[in-house]
């Protein structure tokens, strides 16, 4: 009885692995957005090292752009 249960669980797990395999592409790469432009792109100020990516900017900083979802590119006020 235990052997048939093990075979069932193995087949069950194998089924979900096969279902999750992409059809002819790398997993998720067709949906990812690359860096120049897009939701996960870092703004130019932060990319050049003039700012920092944070959830909220501190009082002495201003928002210079977006780093990724829910993150601002914060730069010192002049």
UniProtKB/Swiss-Prot annotation:
Keywords (alphabetical) are: Antibiotic, Antimicrobial, Defensin, Disulfide bond, Secreted, Signal
Does the record carry Transmembrane helix as a key word?
A: no
Report the SS bond pairs: 46-73, 53-67, 57-74
User: Signal peptide span per the entry?
Assistant: 1-27
Q: Which Pfam families match?
A: Defensin_beta_2
What this protein is reported to do is described as: Has antibacterial activity.
A Gene Ontology CC term for this entry?
extracellular region
One GO BP annotation here? defense response to Gram-negative bacterium
Q: What is its main location?
A: secreted
InterPro entries from the entry? Beta_defensin_dom
Q: What is this protein called?
A: Beta-defensin 12
Q: Which family does it belong to?
A: Belongs to the beta-defensin family.
